[in-house]
UniProtKB/Swiss-Prot annotation:
GO terms for cellular component: membrane. It comes from Brucella melitensis biotype 2 (strain ATCC 23457). Its EC number is 1.6.5.2. InterPro entries: Flavodoxin/NO_synth, Flavoprotein-like_sf, Flavoprotein_WrbA-like, FMN_Rdtase-like_dom, NQO. It is an enzyme of class 1 (oxidoreductase). Binds 1 FMN per monomer. Residues 163-177 have a biased composition (Polar residues). Pfam families: FMN_red (PF03358). This is NAD(P)H dehydrogenase (quinone). Residues 157-181 are annotated as: Disordered.
Amino acid sequence: MVKMLVLYYSAYGYMEQMAKAAAEGAREGGAEVTLKRVPELVPEEVAKASHYKIDQEAPIATPGELADYDAIIIGTATRYGMMASQMKNFLDQTGGLWAKGALINKVGSVMVSTATQHGGAELALISTQWQMQHHGMIIVPLSYACREQMGNDVVRGGAPYGMTTTADGDGSRQPSAQELDGARFQGRRVAEITAKLHG
């Protein structure tokens, strides 16, 4: 059975929802899934004053455990067209894994959230994939196999590189049913492809 980690960073809970949906999809695809998050870097008093969702259930991951999985889906908030610093800080601690080649041929995939439609989602998806590529991981994108992202009748998440959600910072727009379905699709797709590669 494929062992998968869904690893995320979420300040306001939007990516937490997407990560849970991806984990559901991966389980539907036959994977044994672990859902974890990266540590918060913002001081607790600042996080509370900024209304961060600090009561997330997922346990905190450690960089060394990434080697324990066949596949890793990363979900991160976006800051100025890049992954959030919390995720970058976590990934920057994986140098020891890189030196050992511990993630070579593992499967990787990425999802992101932005506060606006043009908030740099595709840049964040691609730059996060770069980190995976430096580790020798095999990237499985969302791709246009996920037809739910097609159309412009409403704000739709998704890109060929990975699932996205646009969620307002004030909480007025949460991840849509289409975006959550896309995250499930991505989780299932990664699980199924990983099973073919590592089965």
